[in-house]
């Protein structure tokens, strides 16, 4: 049964400015595994990557209904499967099924999360 839906969109230039202004921003948002992948990406791809992860984590917090605070950015990890599709793992939410979609354009990153209870 669906118990939550969340969506978030962010401008890539806003994310790029956040990264440039605050060097610790990446450490606050990404888990260690996500940071390792981030470091291997090209400069252009880095902005898309962190913007997509940020939007996905915000979308999850909206689906839960608490916003970021009860769940932290580092409690949420997004790892791509063998086909490149993103999968979300969240500490304390093992009893839920989490559906995630992330998309990018030249100017935006958007993420959608559907949260289900296991029956």
Curated annotation (Swiss-Prot):
Its cofactor is Mg(2+). It comes from the Bacteria. Mg(2+) binds at residues 8, 58. One of its GO terms (cellular component) is cytoplasm. The keyword Cell inner membrane does not apply. It catalyses: apo-[ACP] + CoA = holo-[ACP] + adenosine 3',5'-bisphosphate + H(+). It is found in: Cytoplasm. Belongs to the P-Pant transferase superfamily. AcpS family. NCBIfam families: acpS, pantethn_trn. HAMAP family: AcpS (MF_00101). This is Holo-[acyl-carrier-protein] synthase. It comes from Oceanobacillus iheyensis (strain DSM 14371 / CIP 107618 / JCM 11309 / KCTC 3954 / HTE831). The lineage of its organism: Bacteria, Bacillati, Bacillota, Bacilli, Bacillales. The gene is acpS.
């Amino acid at each position: 049964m669906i118990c939550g839906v969340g969506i978030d969109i962010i401008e890539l230039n806003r994310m790029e400015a956040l990264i440039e202004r605050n060097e610790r921003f990446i450490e606050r948002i990404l888990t260690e595994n996500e940071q390792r992948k981030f470091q291997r990406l090209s400069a252009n791809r880095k902005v898309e990557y962190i913007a997509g992860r940020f939007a996905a984590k915000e979308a999850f917090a909206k689906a839960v209904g608490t916003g970021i605070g009860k769940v932290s950015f580092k409690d949420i990890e997004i790892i791509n499967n063998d086909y490149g599709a993103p999968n979300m793992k969240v500490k304390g939410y093992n009893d839920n099924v989490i559906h995630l979609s992330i998309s990018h354009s030249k100017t935006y990153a958007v993420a959608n999360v559907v949260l289900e209870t296991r029956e």
